[in-house]
Amino acid sequence: MRNIQQALEEHKAAVLKKYPEDKLLGVFLYGSQNYGTSTENSDVDTKAILIPSFGDLILREPVSKEIRLANNEHCEVKDIRELVKMFKKQNINFLEILYTDYCWVNPFYKEVWEDTFIKNRDKIVYYDVNKTIQSICGQAINTIKQDPLNGKKISNGFRLYYFLADYTNGKPYRECIKQPQEKLDFLTELKLQESLPDSTKADELLAAFTQIKGLDVTMDDEAKHIHNIAEVSMEIGLRRLIRLYDDFWSIHSDSGRML
């Protein structure tokens, strides 16, 4: 099985061939290893987050690119402004990096990252419950419709269904991401089937997600409070990280290095 820490180092090295290390917040694992459903042949995929300068804010569009490694693994490179947008959209493929056990965080940014985003992650992931429901249902329906007989896609559909059931019941996000072993065994067994005998499971999932997508959860006072704390923490974190990069650049400007 692929060594995750080694993979992170390789992904980091690939990013640093294109971007300077002082702009790199970190490299974070996302995907099946976080969910406990990885297999012997599972790739390691990551997200690398960049910090823009004040000049970047004015002159450049946020970076959003993909690096494909020689072994066909992927590293998605995002400006932190785009990351915050994904957090506010409640995109679980990005939110999960707040909980992964596998990441490299630049020591220069580590304290601010942990003091803002990690410290408030349990509120960020409940920033907008309705957006989470819509995001997951949309992702699940799209995945299932791609191939209703593909075991890997149906396994992913069930994983998202279990996640949503736990999330809407207020479970801690980490528990929503990684299911109990009995469910993991079921998900892995499904995932390993290249073709299912019929579309029964797909039909059941599509019906369930279509029904859930129609729900509208009222934001009560507690939910509004969580939303506001998450909003402020993300904005403060974003500003502090950008200012930190610019302070670093000001101190080292005599190096003559170009951005």
Language-model features: where?
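Generic structural signal for hydrophobic core residues of well-folded globular domains
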Residues: 50, 87, 161-168, 245
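Conserved nucleotidyltransferase catalytic core and NTase-mimicking acidic/glycine-rich helix/loop elements
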Residues: 107-240
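A generic fold-level signal
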Residues: 22, 39-41, 152
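A basic- and aromatic-enriched beta-loop-alpha substructure that forms the phosphate/nucleotide-
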Residues: 57-139
